[in-house]
Amino acid sequence: MKSAAGQVAILYLIVLVGFICDKVKLFTEATAKATINLLLYIITPCIIIDSFLKMEYSPARAKKFFLALGLMFLLHIVAIVLNLPFFRKKGGPYNPIYKYASIYGNVGFMALPLAKAVLGAKGVFYCSSGLIAFNVITFTHGVRVMAGDNYKFDWKKLIVNPGVLGVAIGLPLFLLDVQVPTVIAQPISLIAGLNTAVAMLIFGTYLANTDLKTMFLAKGIYLVALFKLIVLPVSCILLFKLMGIQGALLVACAISASVPSGNNTFMFSSKYGLDVGMASKTVALVSVFSIFTMPVIIAFAQSMA
């Protein structure tokens, strides 16, 4: 396993490039929004499929994947339970935003690149299971938090999304030990290789368009950051260690638990009539803090692994 601090530093140097590119109008937020579709619908499924293709099948590895899937569901359940005492005041206009942001992390754009950087294909293999857990729980509990009285369950969004589709294609290929021809596997691998740079460049443009001054004045965001970046990952690492989880699987779970609040925070805020500005500031500030907390959390997990 590679140094977490070094790998996070590399990722955020790419974020800095994206930040600068936006400021000089070379790669702007408008361009990034169009690129998000490429990242979400093409690159993300490819990186998941590629991770399955690069893992040689064995019953032990298959068992590890399903164990990882169970742990990722447990991670979200732990987050929901630990979060119960927080943001309970009824009528608080920002409480749904804060609650969602403190539970649901950026498991696609942040966890997968970081897992690949720290653990390689094995890390993506484990963390891709987190996309299944995330989508199942965010489109049930998460939507309920954000929608409130307007909650309506949507099976289509639960099942038909890039993360789940990537696993739906890659997992059977892995379990059946299918030897995919190089002419197909190589393009998938090349597209998957774009994930880290593209995701971090987009994130840089996002930070460049956030009012960094006013976001530091919102006190509730600090509580979100404390819970999402420290309380949750440390609790999960200790719990999973007590359960006997170790090695790369423990570190992969720590990565998924330690990433900052997900972009769905402001997307759901827009859809359900909440304050999108506050949602954007929350995601941005928690993301800034994660620059310092993620290396520490992952290093802690590596020491426990």
Predicted segments with their positions:
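Alpha-helical transmembrane segments of multi-pass small-molecule/ion transporters
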Residues: M1-A305
